[in-house]
A protein has these predicted regions:
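Nucleotidyltransferase catalytic core that binds NTPs
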Residues: 1-173
Length: 173
């Protein structure tokens, strides 16, 4: 059995408390925005990492998703948005970031996220996962559900920012 070492703190070499919030964000929702905003007091910088999943065919290309996320956080110097297509553990190691931020909507999310946190920690022992429960009003939101509702001309104005709703309507209606 491999020897496990004590994880590093969440401080990067620059002394900043940094975290990565990774996802496809196709599209970003108020649930995502809420997790990021509630996590900001704990970190000096959060890197929102637009990732590619081989399992999912995104509605929007990565540069569009990146812009949609950036538009949610204009003026917020503690949020940086990047695109990455490799392993999250490798990105974290390369950028000297030791914390992954994840939002949890329910027990089914926890099961999946626990598996991912364990695998990421096995690939990069300096990496820890910071879980935040979704706020009650966003507990049921997911990007797939939003795309389904809007494709039938439903109202998603309380689920996504206005610029995201506009982009969704342009693409799906």
């Amino acid at each position: 059995m491999a020897k496990r070492t004590k994880a590093k703190s969440n401080h990067s070499e620059s002394g900043k408390r940094m975290a990565i919030y990774s996802g496809t964000f196709d599209p970003i929702t108020f649930g995502h925005v809420d997790v990021i905003k509630r996590a900001l007091p704990f970190f000096d910088e959060i890197v929102v990492l637009i990732s590619h999943s081989g399992k999912k065919k995104p509605l929007f290309e990565a540069p569009v998703r990146k812009q949609l996320v950036e538009d949610c956080f204009k003026g917020e110097s503690k949020v940086r948005v990047e695109v990455h297509s490799g392993l999250l553990a490798d990105y974290a190691r390369k950028n000297n970031i030791h914390v992954i931020l994840r939002g949890l909507r329910g027990i089914s999310d926890f099961d999946y996220e626990f598996q991912m946190a364990t695998m990421n920690n096995r690939m990069n022992q300096d990496l820890q996962t910071f879980f935040l429960m979704a706020s009650e009003q966003y507990f049921f939101i997911n990007s797939t559900l939003i795309k389904e509702v809007i494709s039938h001309a439903g109202d998603v104005s309380e689920l996504v920012p206005p610029h995201v709703e506009k982009k969704l309507r342009e693409r799906l209606c």
